[in-house]
C-alpha cells in the first residue's frame, strides 16, 4: 500500500515543470480523492470532473493527512498553500520526506519480484536451447540426405542425359520428403514450449503474489497478459520455423527445376554446383532460424521487465522509474503514465479496503 502511494505521488514530483508535467498534475487535480478510491478505477481516466478549487484543495489536504504516518512520528502534515504553484512546491517537499522513508521498501519489493521473474527466464531457457539444438541437428540431417557429391553421382552423370535427369528427379523427391519430415520434428518442441510457458507463468503467479504491490485482481490480469503474450510469440516462432523450411524447400526445388531444364537442353550437370546450392540454402535457414529464436528470447526479457515495473515499480531514484518524455512521443508517454496511474488508483483502493478489513477484525489494534 505504501509503495503504490509513494510511486503515484512521486510521479508528480518527476513531471512537475514541463507541459507534460502540467498534464500529469491536471490528472490528479481533476479527479477527487474520495471518488478515486470508491469508484471503478478504469473509469477514472475518462471522467472530467469540474469541481471547485476549494474542493480540490480539500481533497489534497485529506490526502496528505492520510500520508501523515509515513512522514515519521511527531510530524503533522501542513495544510496546502492556497495557489496551484504553491501546491506543487509543497507536494514536492512532502514527497521528498515520504519517498526517502519508503525508498528501501520499494527497492526491496522491486528486487524480490525481479528475482522471481529471473527464475521464469531461467526456466524457459532449456526450451529455447532445445530448439536451437534441433535446428542444428536438422541442418546436419538435411545436409547428409541431400548430399550429391560422391563416386556414385559422378558415375551416374557420366552415363548421359537420362542418368542426369534421373538424378535430379530423385533429388527433387528427397528435398520434398526430408523438409516435410523435419517440419514434423519441430511440432513436439513447439508444443512443449507453449505448455512450459503456461506452467511456469502460473508458478510465477504464486511465487510473486506476496511481493507484488499490485492488487490481486491486477496481479492476475498482468500474469494472464504475460502468459498470453509469450504463448502467442511462441506460436509465432513455430510458424516462422515452418515458413523457413517451406522457403528452403521451394528454393531448392526451383534450383533443381532450372538444372533439369538445362539438362534437357543438353547442358552438362555440375554436381559441385548443386551441392554448393544445398549448402548455402541450409546455412541461410540455420542463420535465419537462430536469429528468430534469439529474438524470442529477447522478447521474454522485455516482457518480464515490463511486468516487473507493473507489479513492483522501482523506487523514484531508479533510472527506470519513469519513461523518457521526448518531444516526438510525449503524447504516447503521457498515455502510458495515465494508464499507470489508473492501475495505481486500483491498487490504492484495494490497499485501503484491506486496511479497513484489518481494523474491523482487530478492535484492539484499532483502538490502540
From Swiss-Prot:
Q: Provide the GO MF annotations for this entry.
A: heparin binding; lipase binding; lipoprotein lipase activator activity; low-density lipoprotein particle receptor binding; phosphatidylcholine binding
The answer to whether keyword Secreted applies is yes
Where is it localised? Secreted; Early endosome; Late endosome; Golgi apparatus, trans-Golgi network
UniProt miscellaneous comment: Mice expressing the human APOAV transgene show a decrease in plasma TG by one third. Conversely, knockout mice lacking APOAV have a four time increase in plasma TG.
Q: Which PANTHER family match?
A: APOLIPOPROTEIN, APOLIPOPROTEIN A-V
Please state which protein family the record places this protein in: Belongs to the apolipoprotein A1/A4/E family.
What is this protein's name?
Answer: Apolipoprotein A-V
Q: Which gene encodes it?
A: Apoa5
Amino acid at each position: 500500500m505504501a509503495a503504490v502511494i509513494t510511486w503515484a505521488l512521486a510521479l508528480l514530483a518527476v513531471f512537475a515543470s514541463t507541459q507534460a508535467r502540467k498534464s500529469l498534475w491536471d490528472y490528479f487535480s481533476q479527479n477527487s480523492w474520495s471518488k478515486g478510491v470508491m469508484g471503478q478505477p478504469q473509469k477514472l481516466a475518462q471522467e472530467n470532473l469540474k469541481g471547485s478549487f476549494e474542493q480540490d484543495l480539500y481533497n489534497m489536504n485529506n490526502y496528505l493527512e492520510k500520508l501523515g504516518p509515513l512522514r515519521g512520528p511527531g510530524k503533522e502534515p501542513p495544510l496546502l498553500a492556497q495557489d496551484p504553484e504553491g501546491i506543487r512546491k509543497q507536494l514536492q517537499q512532502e514527497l521528498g520526506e515520504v519517498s526517502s522513508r519508503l525508498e528501501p521498501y520499494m527497492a526491496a519489493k522491486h528486487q524480490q519480484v525481479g528475482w522471481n521473474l529471473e527464475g521464469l527466464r531461467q526456466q524457459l531457457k532449456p526450451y529455447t536451447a532445445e530448439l536451437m539444438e534441433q535446428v542444428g541437428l536438422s541442418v546436419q540431417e538435411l545436409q547428409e540426405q541431400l548430399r550429391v557429391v560422391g563416386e556414385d553421382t559422378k558415375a551416374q552423370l557420366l552415363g548421359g542425359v537420362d542418368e542426369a535427369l534421373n538424378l535430379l528427379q530423385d533429388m527433387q523427391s528427397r528435398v520434398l520428403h526430408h523438409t516435410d519430415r523435419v517440419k514434423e520434428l519441430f511440432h513436439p518442441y513447439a508444443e512443449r514450449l507453449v505448455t512450459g510457458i503456461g506452467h511456469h507463468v502460473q508458478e510465477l503467479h504464486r511465487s510473486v503474489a506476496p511481493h507484488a504491490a499490485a492488487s490481486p485482481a491486477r496481479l492476475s490480469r498482468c500474469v494472464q497478459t504475460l502468459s498470453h503474450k509469450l504463448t502467442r510469440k511462441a506460436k509465432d516462432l513455430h510458424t516462422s520455423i515452418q515458413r523457413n523450411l517451406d522457403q528452403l524447400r521451394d528454393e531448392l526445388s526451383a534450383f533443381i527445376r532450372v538444372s533439369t531444364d538445362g539438362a534437357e537442353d543438353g547442358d552438362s550437370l555440375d554436381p559441385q554446383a548443386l551441392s554448393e546450392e544445398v549448402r548455402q540454402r541450409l546455412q541461410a535457414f540455420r542463420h535465419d532460424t537462430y536469429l528468430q529464436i534469439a529474438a524470442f528470447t529477447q522478447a521474454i526479457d522485455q516482457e518480464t521487465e515490463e511486468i516487473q515495473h507493473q507489479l513492483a515499480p522501482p523506487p523514484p531514484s531508479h533510472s527506470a522509474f519513469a519513461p523518457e518524455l521526448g518531444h516526438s512521443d510525449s503524447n504516447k508517454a503521457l498515455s502510458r503514465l495515465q494508464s499507470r496511474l489508473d492501475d495505481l488508483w486500483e491498487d490504492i483502493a484495494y490497499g485501503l479496503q484491506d486496511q479497513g478489513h484489518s481494523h474491523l477484525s482487530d478492535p484492539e489494534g484499532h483502538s490502540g
